[in-house]
Amino acid sequence: MSAASVSKVVVVFSGGQDSTTCLIQALTQFDEVHGITFDYGQRHREEIEVAKSLAKRLKITSHKVMDVSLLNELAISALTRDAIPVSHELMENGLPNTFVPGRNILFLTLAGIFAYQLGAEAIITGVCETDFSGYPDCRHDFVRAMESALVQGMDKKLEIITPLMWLNKAQTWALADKYQQLDLVRHHTLTCYNGIVGDGCGDCPACHLRKRGLEDYLQNKAEVMASLDKATATGKPQA
């Protein structure tokens, strides 16, 4: 399915840097942009109110908040249990302790059902394989498998668009700046695992990744913007 044939999309929208940047871009490309946010009892559930506020501010077509608290019951993680501190070290299985098993499987499934009801042709999600947190459900192969499952399971043409898949964090900041929304993304989104808007706590892994990317972009704007244009043009991982 070509982008030209898509007019109505559903954005998986957490209120964080990545999904907000995807939402901003979608508003320039599609006629109808619908957001869906998931409340799974997450540690940083302040992001839900941030998502609501941003949805109104950016004037998207509609915004749905879904209660998926069953995920909290099933998936034990530092993001679903306040008693488990966020760690900078990997667990024995090689994954961060902030990994929530099945989260993106559930989110994309529900977003697919929502898209079906709306008659939307695509789902947009801000997952990224190039500069990511080590989550297996952020990988390109996973997304393509989910897309195939949704198409076959609902007998409907449906594309999962991943604008950030092959971008690093600096390039994601550049993308927000390209749409003149760098300040909004920097100061009004919530990426921090401890629920602090903007630059966050500065200590959790999410804040470290976000800060490092921002510093890289601000120090090398022209170079990063050029690399963004190249990555966007090819749609492939950069050497």
From Swiss-Prot:
Keywords: ATP-binding, Ligase, Metal-binding, Nucleotide-binding, Queuosine biosynthesis, Zinc. Catalyzes the ATP-dependent conversion of 7-carboxy-7-deazaguanine (CDG) to 7-cyano-7-deazaguanine (preQ(0)). Gene3D superfamilies: HUPs. InterPro entries: QueC, Rossmann-like_a/b/a_fold. This is 7-cyano-7-deazaguanine synthase. Binds 1 zinc ion per subunit. It catalyses: 7-carboxy-7-deazaguanine + NH4(+) + ATP = 7-cyano-7-deazaguanine + ADP + phosphate + H2O + H(+). One of its GO terms (molecular function) is ATP binding. Zn(2+) binds at residues 192, 201, 204, 207. Its cofactor is Zn(2+). The keyword RNA-binding does not apply.
